Amino acid sequence: RNKYKQIENIGVVCVIYKLKKGVSKHFWVNINDERFELPGLIEFSNLRKIENDLKIIYLPYYMPITHEKFEKNDEYFFEETFNYLQMLNPNLEKEDVIDFSVNKLKYAQPICDVGFKEKIPPIQTDIEDLYIADTCFYYPEDRGVSESIKLAKTIIEKIVI
């Protein structure tokens, strides 16, 4: 438990839209524009089609959970992000919004500072046959599906063998 407390994480506010219209033809769009407080957007429906040709868009705000913006309400995030979406697709209107949600996660990603490797706790806990799968185990890689699969295989091998 103490080893986990040593690992500092960054939080994320995940804003998700279900829309009638998309904003891009791309799955992943990095944004390097000072008018946007986002690193980018992910339009999942450009990777995999959704029923009725609906569009699913994910907008992440990575920040420390102590940042004042982390405490803002859903309406604040709707207004700000919808403005961003309209900058990308001026034809988008509020009537195109089918659904919208804001989700906040305190432990989105570990902050890998100097000496991080030594902070990583063992996968096996003190409780027999209880293993923990955490993104800190991906180090030195970043979060990703392939890293999740690799960690799952490692744990399965420990359980089965």
List each language-model region with its residue ranges.
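Mid-domain catalytic core of redox enzymes
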Residues: 1-71, 75, 80-92, 122-123
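A short coil-to-beta-strand element that immediately follows conserved catalytic motifs
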Residues: 12, 91-105
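FAD-binding beta-loop-beta segment adjacent to the flavin cofactor pocket
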Residues: 46-53, 104-132, 136-139
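Residues at alpha-helix caps and immediate loop-helix transition turns in enzyme cores, especially N-
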Residues: 73, 112-116, 144
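Active-site-proximal substrate-binding core of FAD-dependent oxidoreductases
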Residues: 95, 159-161
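A conserved FAD-binding loop/helix module that cradles the flavin
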Residues: 134-159
